[in-house]
């Protein structure tokens, strides 16, 4: 995907300054390594709630990242990462069907286990640099999130990041939307691998 197209969709190579993103939340969004490991370190009880996993049409800016010629269905997984019974992250993963079978075979059987628990222990997995966005209420990911968490409706903007993971010829796009719980949850556990 071209950098120009990504910018038009709101995705940039750095998190834009926004006074509504305080330093603690910015630290969560821009931190390196496994977000799962950082969330585990910052909570007494961590769990994954799988919301959806099936073949679905990716959003316009996703299918181009995946290298698809059109909006053919892709394996889509949506989960909430929950810290101390508070939703902290809405995660949205898309991968081409044939890549899911060949390069990411564990994905279909993951259930309510964290994806990060598999990605960061596999030496064959490479991660591209992050792209960041400020998701406004009209963004398709916000609309999907609203169906799950209607309480997010009055929140004017949610920061998000996404990254492409590569394994063999397979490309997987993982997008993480950072929810208000992380405004006050201390970010620690940087440098851990999970």
Curated annotation (Swiss-Prot):
Residues that, per the record, bind substrate: 77, 115, 176
SUPFAM superfamilies linked: Chorismate lyase-like
EC number from the UniProt entry: 4.1.3.40
GO biological process, one term: pyruvate biosynthetic process
Catalysis: reaction(s): chorismate = 4-hydroxybenzoate + pyruvate
Enzyme category, top tier: lyase
Subcellular location: Cytoplasm
Pfam families registered for this protein in UniProt: Chor_lyase
Coiled-coil segments: none
Domain of life: Bacteria
Protein's job: Removes the pyruvyl group from chorismate, with concomitant aromatization of the ring, to provide 4-hydroxybenzoate (4HB) for the ubiquinone pathway.
HAMAP family membership: UbiC
The family this protein is said to belong to: Belongs to the UbiC family.
Protein name, per record: Probable chorismate pyruvate-lyase
Organism of origin: Cupriavidus pinatubonensis (strain JMP 134 / LMG 1197)
